[in-house]
Regions:
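Active-site alpha-helical elements of protease catalytic centers
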Residues: 13-30
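Metal-dependent amide/peptide-bond hydrolase catalytic core
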Residues: 116, 120-350
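Short secondary-structure boundary/capping elements
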Residues: 22-25, 52, 288
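Histidine/acidic-residue-rich, glycine-tolerant segments that coordinate divalent metal ions
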Residues: 2-11, 17-18, 34-155, 165
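Glycine/charged-rich beta-loop-alpha catalytic/anionic-binding loops adjacent to active sites
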Residues: 1-13, 99-103, 276-280, 318-327
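Generic recognition of short, well-ordered alpha-helical segments
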Residues: 25, 55-59, 110, 174, ...
Length: 350
């Protein structure tokens, strides 16, 4: 089951290969409804590339595109059927670029100014910063250029990409400023030059209970997928390839009554597929992770659902999610999303 597929087939570690098609399906249904009834209304299908890190919706927001709308609806593949509630982290992506002087690491080390040392010192400084960050803050990094592959060279260039998250945009910007100072200090210590490249930023979503209730009402009315024996068997086999503990859905983590309901429906989390609708739940809790849907919500009322496209409690950004993303399970979840979004949009129009 875990093996590379030749070529460049469809698939994504977070199910994003299903996102656009599900939303497009909803747009087509709404269009046909307007044509059939003669009612007036405008439905716009937005293609938003780079949602995994390019934050296209934030660039739309910069141009005030979402402010033109009466409402915005979207969905995200998941292992459960539920209405999304609460918020998530504001996030800033930024690359720190250090430039130094190359030299022979043994023959003339004193002539070198190591950009790699600067990047590593920056990372160490950020580790010490963690103790003094807010409880909602998190910082992640990855080397995008470590300078080279020869250890006997003082590396003259290094790049490290940071994701800086906080509960609000304002707090994320403040944390970014502290990370900037650490980078500046690392450059000062190593006598290297620092430059930065802002990549993108996303805002924390604004939860809207009224929109959540509208989506849930329509979710209840849409028939959820029925799976074949083969799909159940596939899901069970895939579920056996990863560790899973606890119960699916964040609602079960915060609400004891919902936890009891989910525990019963999933046989204590052992069930391979979540073929039911999670109970209605509204929260203002800030969850980990980030989404550019947040930028939309600051300009127009926004609602989002999750639909089951993979086995229960499948880890995100995993080969298991990729594998599930081209199956009938995923396609059924995608079509469910189209139906729920279309029905909710029609209610808004009416």
């Amino acid at each position: 089951m875990e093996k590379p597929v030749p070529g460049n087939p469809n698939g994504h570690g977070c199910g994003h290969n299903l996102l656009g098609a599900g939303a497009l399906g909803a747009a087509i249904v709404i269009k046909e409804y307007l044509k059939a009834t003669g009612k007036s209304g405008t439905v716009i299908f937005y293609g938003c590339p780079g949602e995994e890190g390019g934050a296209a919706k934030a660039f739309f927001a910069r141009e005030n595109e979402w402010a033109k709308l009466d409402a915005a609806l979207t969905w995200h593949p998941d292992d459960v059927n539920q209405v999304v509630t609460g918020s998530s982290m504001a996030c800033i992506q930024k690359e720190y670029i250090f430039s130094g002087v190359a030299s022979h690491a043994a023959g003339a080390p004193e002539q070198g100014r190591s950009a790699l040392d600067a990047a590593e010192l920056m990372n160490i400084g950020v580790q010490f910063l963690r103790e003094h960050m807010g409880k909602n803050a998190s910082v992640h990094y990855a080397f995008t250029d470590a300078g080279g592959v020869s250890p006997n060279v003082v590396q003259s260039k290094a790049k490290v990409l940071y994701m800086i998250r906080e509960a609000t945009v304002q707090d994320a910007v403040k944390l970014e400023a502290r990370v900037d100072k650490i980078a500046q200090g690392a450059a000062l210590m190593t006598e290297t030059q620092l430059s930065t490249r802002f990549i993108d930023g996303t805002a924390n979503p604004l939860p809207l209970k009224t929109m959540e209730q509208l989506l849930y009402k329509n979710f209840v009315q849409v028939a959820l997928p029925e799976y074949t024996e083969e799909e159940w068997a596939y899901a069970a086999a895939l579920k056996n390839t990863y560790e899973s503990a606890g119960l699916p859905s964040y609602a079960a983590k915060f609400d004891e009554n919902i936890a009891q309901t989910v525990d019963k429906a999933t046989d204590g989390g052992k069930r391979a597929l979540n073929d039911f609708l999670m109970p209605m739940y509204h929260s203002s809790v800030t969850l980990p992770g980030s989404t550019d849907v947040g930028d939309v919500s600051w300009q127009t009322p926004t609602g989002q659902i999750n639909c089951a496209t993979a086995p229960s409690m499948v880890p995100g950004h995993s080969w298991q999610m990729v594998s599930a993303g081209t199956t009938g399970i995923a396609h059924k979840g995608m079509l469910t999303a189209a139906k729920v979004l279309a029905a909710a949009a029609i209610d808004i129009i009416d």
